Regions:
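Active-site/ligand-binding-proximal alpha/beta "capping" segment
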Residues: 168-222
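Short, acidic/turn-prone active-site loops that include or flank metal/cofactor-
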Residues: 26-27, 51-52, 125-127, 194-196, ...
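Short hydrophobic alpha-helical runs that function as membrane-insertion/retention elements
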Residues: 47, 119-123, 211
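RNA substrate-binding interface of SAM-dependent RNA methyltransferases
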Residues: 10-17, 82-176
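General small-molecule cofactor/ligand-binding pocket signal
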Residues: 22, 45-49, 148, 163, ...
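Surface-exposed amphipathic alpha-helices with a cationic face
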Residues: 40, 157-161, 235
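Structured adenosyl-cofactor binding patch, chiefly the S-adenosyl-L-methionine
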Residues: 9, 14-15, 19, 114, ...
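N-terminal positively charged helical leader segments and presequences
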Residues: 1-83
Length: 240
């Protein structure tokens, strides 16, 4: 927790992720307006609350603003992939396209860590916040696995392909089943949002587009469940 105008500004300048911001109702200043604008532009929840609420959060001089900071440090995918190769291993990356539900995100992180995934890639905007709910659902995995927040997913796909990874999208529109594909090499799997699936722009860039066969009447799965199936199929194939 960070309180006071200048400390919150410094946290933002340092590139730290804000989880949520509380602002005293009726308080107006240019500095606070800039912080609120930044928060809203980055889809950080802002609540205007009575001063009594802020006083309960901290007894110190909060100047009408209290911010909660994301509990993890983001990594860069450009550093993670070479590091994995240097260790003599084949990179295993999961890309999430606009997965916004924090509990789904936490469950995915827990599954990915258990499956030995080297990094989870998320967009800088339109992704779930790494907050207390996400951390709890992940059973602590979010503090252990590499999470890479990127400005441009297209550029990341291109980087991964240039680095020797096969980038594979998974959705109900895939042309080949997961069981028919070779997932043993360096790989990045892409999973789509709960509402819209994977963006068409990304589907045009990937190496392959696969489907999890479902003989039942329901033709889609929760994204965290689907990610679990896919990641552990990679594990199964790699273990032989």
């Amino acid at each position: 927790m960070v309180f006071g105008v200048h400390p919150v500004e410094e946290v933002i300048k340092a590139g730290k992720e804000l989880e949520k911001v509380f602002v005293q109702s009726g308080l107006r200043s240019q500095q606070i307006s800039e912080i609120v604008k930044y928060a809203k532009n980055h889809e950080v929840p802002v609540q205007f609350v009575p001063i009594e609420k802020l006083n309960r959060l901290t007894r110190k001089n909060h100047q009408g603003i209290v911010a909660f900071v994301c509990p993890i440090s983001y990594q860069t995918i450009e550093n993670v992939v070479p590091m994995v190769y240097d260790e003599g291993r084949m990179p295993f990356v999961v890309i999430l396209d606009r997965v916004t539900d924090v509990r789904n995100f936490g469950a995915i992180a827990r599954t990915c860590y258990a499956a030995g995934v080297d990094a989870i890639v998320i967009p800088s905007r339109g992704s779930a916040l790494i907050n207390g709910d996400a951390m709890k659902t992940s059973a602590g995995a979010l503090s252990l696995i590499n999470v890479c927040r990127v400005e441009n997913i297209k550029d990341t796909i291109d980087f991964l392909k240039a680095s020797g990874l096969k980038v594979i999208a998974f959705s109900e529109k895939g042309k080949q089943t997961i069981w028919q594909a070779d997932l043993t090499g360096p790989i990045a799997i892409m999973m789509g949002s709960e509402e819209d699936g994977i963006s068409e722009a990304y589907l045009k860039r990937v190496d392959d587009h696969l489907v999890i066969p479902m003989p039942g009447d329901i033709d889609s799965l929760n994204v965290s469940v689907a990610t679990g199936i896919v990641t552990f199929e990679v594990v199964r194939q790699r273990l032989g």
